[in-house]
Design a protein with these regions (language model features):
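Long, compositionally biased intrinsically disordered regulatory segments in eukaryotic proteins
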Residues: 1-118
């Protein structure tokens, strides 16, 4: 693990959920605490490929969420634009923990309840 105390894999997963994954990648590369090996691994990542991969991650997560929660699917059907904004916030804040749609749906519903009570 590097001096930044976040593993390479954890960083990539977090960056993939950010609004601007390439900016996160560039910031990490510029981090003076990063060891040389990890910096080189990050520099080897194609920025366009990273951006496309992040879009695919978000798309697949969105699809999983739609399949995993009828409540969420109804919310999207009622106001797609408003739901897209909520999904962006959820996607950025909540790490992906399961490939199963029903688990993604439950995670989202729990997150939404916490947001409503905050």
């Amino acid at each position: 693990m590097s001096a930044t105390s976040e593993s390479f894999t954890a960083f990539v997963a977090r960056a993939m959920r950010s609004p601007d994954p390439v900016a996160r990648l560039r910031e990490r590369i510029a981090d003076a605490r990063l060891d040389a090996d990890e910096r080189e691994r990050l520099r080897a990542i194609d920025e366009d490929g990273f951006r496309v991969a992040a879009l695919l991650v978000a798309k697949l997560r969105f699809e999983r969420l739609m399949q995993g929660s009828p409540l969420v699917a109804r919310g999207f059907a009622i106001d797609a634009r408003a739901f897209a904004d909520v999904f962006r916030e959820y996607h950025e804040q909540v790490p992906m923990t399961s490939p199963m749609p029903w688990e993604e749906g439950k995670t989202f519903e729990n997150w939404a309840r916490r947001q409503a009570n905050a």
